Amino acid sequence: MTAKTFRIGGIHPEENKLTHEVATQTAPLPKQAIFPLSQHIGAPTKPVVQKGDKVKVGTLIAEAGGFVSAPIFSSVSGTVAKIDTAIDATGYRKPCIIINVEGDEWEESIDRSDKLELVKDHPELTPEEIVTRIKDAGVVGMGGACFPTFIKLTPPPTAKAECVIVNAVECEPYITADYRLMMEHADEILVGLELLMKGAKVTTGYIGIETNKPAAIALLTEKCAQVFGASTYHVEVVPLQQRYPQGGEKQLVDAVIRRQVPAPPAIPVNVGAIVQNVGTAYAVYQAVMKHKPLFERYTTVTGKRLAKPGNYLVRMGTPMQDLIALCGGMPEGDNKLLAGGPMMGKALTSTEVPICKGTNSVTILSGDDARRKEPQPCIRCAKCVGVCPMGLEPYLLAKLSEVKNWERAEHEDIVSCIECGSCQFTCPAHRPLLDNIRQGKQTVMGIIRNRNAK
């Protein structure tokens, strides 16, 4: 089968998949867990615990703060130390719940067995029941965007879902958490996909995987034939070319079903597709079949100078410094700590930042990789235009943001930028294109929100 890909732009950064074949280990419990109240797109959560309260693993500690929101559950047992502020993966101080860890006592409602539960054995699982369980468990997109999953499964009346696409691309350099998840929990992922299809009331599913993961392609192709071969569902594993940002939602839809998602506010379901990360499919299985809220995730801890980079199943709230210590500690010399990968990750100033729902990687860049080169004047080469997967003009958007020409920036479609970093990666003048565009995009989106609220 010929590998597919998206049609506009794209780059080929060095993979650096250092932990590709490193089996996942379970990270030890932290001494203290930190839970930011905003771990998703939408309204922050509201605490339902207070200082001195006892909690177990799986206890609700913060309820959804609005329709677009997702509850947060404790990943540890212990005592609530305080409700305070702490630096989260955005780099800013945000409200959080801090819990002192005592033992590892779980809520009795959680099924901790390894038995694989199948959808056909649970007739009570109507589409509505599936969506409710996903919502109540706080499941969000695990690829980094953290959009509440239940909302994607209930599109507006103006849009009709035709298929579910599982995003198993993992095109960001260094990160291998999704790959290890596929190799270690393929059966659960496919049950999760079936639940997503049933919840969305569709019978067609796709799993998009880049060709640099042949073992995962072979394994999931074989499993799909076994699971869905004689069922009413049609599920296909789609090999995709190695090309960044192949895992971008709109790029994935273009590659898999050959449909292009229009500019915002359009979303993939407007062209018939619901896109969910492979980690989300696994979390959906856990939530629906095991009554297990989202409180842990697969995370890669990596860097060229780390002594022992690895993949870990991590309880949310665990400080990054605990994981770095497991890998041999912070390397000597200049280092840059990222929540995420080198293309879209956020640079951090503290190792005390906790693992949250969207933290797919803790990446440490060292030496020259940790230092930015001095920006030079734009040489008008248009390389940034050629690689932009959204067909934008990054040099222009960056300049408009720099001079605060918000009206023109909106006209030039700055809100369509997916912040993939391809422009900045390819710029021979080392200009901070993404930095400027990201700031400008946030400003323009705020202007649009205020205008629509009037």
Residue spans of the language-model regions?
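Acidic low-complexity segments
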Residues: I87-F147, T158, P214, V227
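Histidine-anchored nucleotide/phosphate-binding helix
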Residues: M183-K198
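Hydrophobic alpha-helical positions that pack around
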Residues: V202-M320, L326-G333, G341
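Conserved hydrophobic positions within beta-strands
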Residues: G78-V80
